[in-house]
Amino acid sequence: MKTRLRALYCDHLSIMRGKYLPHSKIGDDSTRFCRSTFGVHYDRDLLDAPGAMMKQGLPDMELKWQHDDIRDSWHASTQIVLGDLYDDAGEKLSLCPRGTLKRAVAAWEEKGLHPKVGIELEAFALQADDNGRLVPYDAPGGVVYGTGPAADPLRFNDRIWAMADEMGFSLDMITAEFDSPQFEYTLTFDNAVKAVDDIVLFRLMAREIALEYGIVLTFMPKPVAEAGGSGMHINLSFTDEAGGNALSSGPRGGPDHMNDLARGCLAGLIHHHKGLAGLIAPTANSYMRLQPGSLSGYWQNWGGDHRNVTTRISSEGGAKARLEHRMADAASNPYTSVAAVLHAARLGVEHNHVLPPIETGDGFDRTDAKHGTAINLAGAIDDLERDTALTEAVGSELCANHIYMKRKEVRKTRDLEGDALRDFYVHFI
């Protein structure tokens, strides 16, 4: 058949929605969707969420893309593209997560700085047992930093690597994580929008390839109760107009070599810690991961080469100087999460927020930090709503939609536990 086009966007639930379109759509073009998908929940409940226009006729929105953004796909005779959403009057849709990230990038570019992002994804591999129940993938020889067939007997990760290479994704690493069968996937630093475009497509590709092996590869934050959690670590830096790394003060990194920009970004991330959680750890399951002593970004703190703090300062300097924010999970929309982190960092710089002292505790038995994220989704959404500086920066309409949908989610999940709670999310994240 003629090559077709798969046109996609990543929605408020971090679900990839799209259409297969004919060969004639390969070029600068567009297609329409129902705007009220922004009021659809995981269980397909239709909700009158702010901006979704569920009770105003369920009007169209338009996905627009450029020819240069079209790329090859991992499926035969198919190309793939991501685009931006517009309302039926042709205006940029305020609910569009990709547009939200572009606005966050533009706010930094007004300062002469260009955000660079590298994202680390973690995921668990599940498979059906003889009764059809999802259980952890059988990899008894898996160990932290494991490679080869002991960690992945079916070798589905080899196929993911090969296809990622063929598709032009710049993989830095695939490895087994601490809790078998958990894996980490890291893509190379790039300009913020390009980096997130790559991560949402890579995540989709990895899940679809794994399904061919009978594996449900889930990026949800805590699918296995007795194991650790899965995060989406956001590494960021900034390129200045001369092409240098604006976070760098020289060849050495770490807390003793931070410049004013790094301190300001850190202060903003600390200041907006509780509000950020509602956007970047956005499910009931997220708060099974966000716990003290779990290396997950719970505490309102920062440190150097320290995995039990929320924002970690790389010991590498020069071109590799960066901040690593460790709170987010991949149940969040990556565009929205990166936008929120960039805005929180920017607000710290602009408002001269005070940076508290570095964390000196080990994070297990002792922690200096006195405050963490909320203990559940309901509390995190309340914290987000209170952080009006953050919600206005990210986008008031997008955040209003998010808050409404997540409060509905609190009610939908409050009586679920164990497999029932996992299965509310697992096939979508």
Task: Annotate the PLM regions.
Residues M1-M173, A195, G372-I429:
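ATP/Mg2+-dependent ligation/transfer catalytic cores
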Residues T3-S77, V81-E109, V193-E359, D365-K370:
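Active-site capping/gating regions of soluble enzymes
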Residues L134, T186, D190-N191, L295, ...:
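Alpha-helix boundary/capping detector
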Residues F124-V224, G228-T239:
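Helix-rich catalytic cores of soluble enzyme domains
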Residues S30-T31, L121, A125, E177, ...:
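Flexible domain-boundary/linker segments
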